[in-house]
UniProtKB/Swiss-Prot annotation:
It comes from Latilactobacillus sakei subsp. sakei (strain 23K). This is UPF0758 protein LCA_0852. Zn(2+) binds at residues 171, 173, 184. SUPFAM superfamilies: RuvA domain 2-like. A motif (JAMM motif) lies at residues 171-184.
């Protein structure tokens, strides 16, 4: 006798039909696991989705914002952030995975998904071999809202460790604006000059805004 999905608890439904069979509310129920003394988990899931319909913008919510939802305490807020980060990393690795031939366009588009909306400035390097295949992606700096003080030695320390022939730098502007600052331009020039001395090429430096990216090479700041 077949069991009706409508009569199953969400976890039972996952076991029989897979997680893809769940509605958003059921999926949230499974993730949250339990409610509170006064609120069943189903109600907490409903309130989560009222705040973030279709889970939209959930990955950008901080711990304070998540805890404003009744029924979500510090532990559940941390778990939700961890799940969002896991999802983000899986999505990035679908294209920015090791061995894939990278280009500025591909890296820029993928990094928009991962860095747009972040409130802290981050500097990353995508290290490549002689065929432009990805060797490693490394976060070099996590800064404040208005400053980034990464040093070229960090960039090249990892380039040497990974035996990289080339790399693409990426950093985000929390303001969402794409225009490079004087600091961005000067830092890029220092990196290019150091790379020429070491025989490790900086292919590009990408700035990630709210929905677009800017290539400093295309803007003429990187010259071979």
């Amino acid at each position: 006798m077949l069991t009706s999905q409508s009569k199953l608890q969400p976890r039972e439904q996952v076991a029989l039909y897979g997680a893809a069979s769940l509605s958003d509310e059921q999926l949230a129920t499974v993730i949250l696991r339990s409610g509170t003394q006064h609120l069943p988990v189903e109600v907490v899931a409903q309130r989560l989705l009222q705040r973030y319909p279709d889970f939209q913008d959930l990955e950008q919510a901080d711990l304070v914002q998540l805890r404003q939802i009744e029924g979500i305490g510090p532990v559940k807020a941390i778990e939700l952030q961890a799940i969002c980060e896991l999802s983000r990393r899986i999505q990035n690795q679908r294209t920015l995975r090791f061995g894939v031939v990278a280009s500025s366009q591909m890296v820029g588009q993928r990094m928009i998904e991962s860095l747009a909306g972040e409130t802290q400035e981050q500097l990353l390097a995508v290290y490549l071999d002689v065929k432009n295949q990805i060797i490693q992606i490394k976060q070099l700096y996590l800064g404040t809202l208005n400053s980034s003080v990464a040093h070229p030695r960090e960039v090249f320390k990892w380039a040497v460790q990974y035996s990289a022939a080339k790399f693409i730098l990426v950093h985000n502007h929390p303001s969402g604006q794409l225009a490079p600052s004087t600091q961005d331009i000067n830092f890029t020039k220092r990196i290019v000059n150091c790379g020429q001395l070491m025989g490790i090429t900086c292919l590009d430096h990408l700035i990630i805004g709210s929905s677009q990216y800017l290539s400093l090479r295309e803007e003429g700041y990187l010259v071979d």
